[in-house]
Regions:
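Divalent metal-dependent phosphate-bond-processing catalytic cores, especially two-metal-ion Mg2+/Mn2+ enzymes
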Residues: 3-31, 44, 79, 95-152
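His-Asp-centered metal-binding catalytic motifs of divalent-metal-dependent phosphohydrolases/nucleases
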Residues: 35-54, 68, 72, 88-96, ...
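Active-site metal-coordination segments of metallo-dependent hydrolases
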Residues: 5-16, 54-67
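Short, flexible helix-adjacent loops and helix caps
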Residues: 29-30, 52-56
């Protein structure tokens, strides 16, 4: 919250992604270690946006993936996090939907998409396409169908 002081939209986005990620992970029975890393990555997943705006005048997802890990590293090291490599990997790949390695990675993608669909007023047709191609977890699929009232 401190990092995005004054920007309620970004703060709320991070909190919503975190809450979806945590809920999906618990229902998918993710172990405590991976859950901790996933929650950390979820709350920080868009942390590179400010740098991207200053450096590129853009908030494009691939640029966030490029710049986010360095910002996150500084924050996590200041908080005495020890094993940060997976968290940084997740932050650096959360807009990459191919070669998804790990349940934590899949859940972060799904949580971010659920929030983005709502925030960007994504059409049901587009949501259905993304659902069919990207969503993999039982819980993420269920949430997507129920939240956006999509039928298959």
């Amino acid at each position: 919250i401190k990092y995005n002081h004054g920007n309620a939209k970004r703060i709320n986005h991070a909190l919503k992604v975190h809450n979806y990620a945590k809920t999906i992970a618990i229902l998918e029975k993710v172990n405590e270690y991976d859950l901790f890393n996933l929650e950390s990555a979820a709350i920080l997943h868009d942390i590179g946006i400010k740098v991207c705006e200053k450096k590129y005048n853009s908030t494009e997802g691939k640029l966030q993936e490029k710049e986010g890990p360095a910002v996150a590293r500084e924050i996590l090291e200041n908080l005495d996090y020890k094993n940060i490599n997976r968290i940084l990997f997740l932050i650096g790949h959360h807009h990459t939907y191919i070669n998804v390695s790990g349940l934590d990675y899949q859940i972060l993608i799904e949580a971010d998409l659920l929030v983005n669909f709502e925030e960007e007023n994504t059409s049901k047709e587009d949501i259905k396409k993304v659902y069919e191609n990207i969503f993999k977890t039982k819980t993420g699929k269920k949430f997507c169908r129920e939240i956006f009232d999509i039928s298959l």
